[in-house]
A protein has these predicted regions:
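Hydrophobic, well-ordered secondary-structure elements that form the walls
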Residues: 2, 66, 86, 107, ...
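Flexible loop/turn segments at secondary-structure boundaries
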Residues: 22, 34, 72-75, 102-104, ...
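Extended ligand-binding regions for polar small-molecule ligands
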Residues: 1-13, 150-166, 170-173
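Periplasmic binding protein-like
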Residues: 88-137, 175
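Append "and occasionally in soluble cytosolic enzymes with long acidic Gly/Pro-rich linkers
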Residues: 1-89, 150, 178
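Conserved catalytic core of Hanks-type protein kinase domains
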Residues: 5, 135, 182
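Short, solvent-exposed loop/beta-turn-alpha elements that line the ligand-binding surface or hinge
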Residues: 32-47, 57-60, 108-112, 133-163, ...
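Bilobed periplasmic-binding protein-like "clamshell/Venus-flytrap" ligand-binding domains
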Residues: 54-70, 114-120, 166-203
């Protein structure tokens, strides 16, 4: 229901514009070993309404909530667009903005965790395994697995995919695709956009290079042209 109510194209085109492109999977499409999943749900409000009728939410008319980082205009607009789409099929969405530290603290406690949390993942390794280990591997005390997802089959496939990356990359590519399809089937995550990280600097600064892994680490040998 929620996945079918998420209008990724509108969000990518009008909210993120040049700072993001529509997601085609659970990891960025330019990531090594990426292969698009078969089961990614398209924006379809009729389908969302159908799922609602079959769900417990539709029977009880309960509200759901979403938290997002309050300093991000893109997260705010995305949340309000989802709220508007869900309202069309009779589902209320409570918007709960906050600082990342506050949202993270609440999400790590099951008693205060929201139904949906809007977040981006900043990888420390240019590999699909970084997303899947960090966000979806079974954890007794969740760190970033804020959906509290636990699936022994996915855990096993993830371990196998990671071990085969160097010697058998095409095997890993297929396994990472299988993991994406499993996560989508289990309604764990709804991908929206692949974010393009931007760097602004004076034209006479040299040595600034893109970091393909953890892009917010700004450690460079900078110089200044005279």
């Amino acid at each position: 229901m929620i996945a079918a109510s998420m209008d990724r194209k509108t969000i990518a085109d009008y909210v993120y514009r040049d700072s993001g492109i529509e997601a085609t999977g659970l990891i960025p499409k330019n990531m090594p070993l990426f292969s698009a999943p078969d089961s990614l749900m398209s924006f379809n409000m009729a389908l969302a309404s159908n799922y609602l009728e079959r769900s417990k939410i539709g029977q009880k008319k309960e509200k759901i909530d979403i938290s997002y980082v309050s300093t991000s205009e893109e997260y705010r607009l995305t949340s309000f667009l989802l709220m508007d789409n869900l309202r069309k099929i009779g589902v209320g969405l409570d918007i709960k903005p906050g600082t990342w530290s506050m949202n993270w603290d609440r999400a790590r406690k099951i008693e205060t965790s929201p139904n949906i949390i809007s977040m981006a993942w900043w990888p420390t390794l240019a590999s699909p395994s970084d997303w899947f280990f960090g966000l979806y591997q079974t954890e007794e005390n969740p760190l970033f697995n804020l959906s509290y997802y636990s699936n022994s089959s996915v855990d096993s496939i993830l371990d196998l995919a990671w071990r085969n990356e160097s010697l058998y990359p095409e095997v890993s590519r297929g396994l990472y695709k299988d993991i994406q399809d499993s996560l989508i089937k289990d309604c764990v995550v709804i991908p929206v956009v692949d974010i393009n990280v931007q760097s602004v600097h004076q034209s006479n600064i040299t040595g600034l290079k893109k970091n393909p892994a953890y892009s917010t680490l700004l450690i460079y040998h900078l110089g200044k042209m005279r």
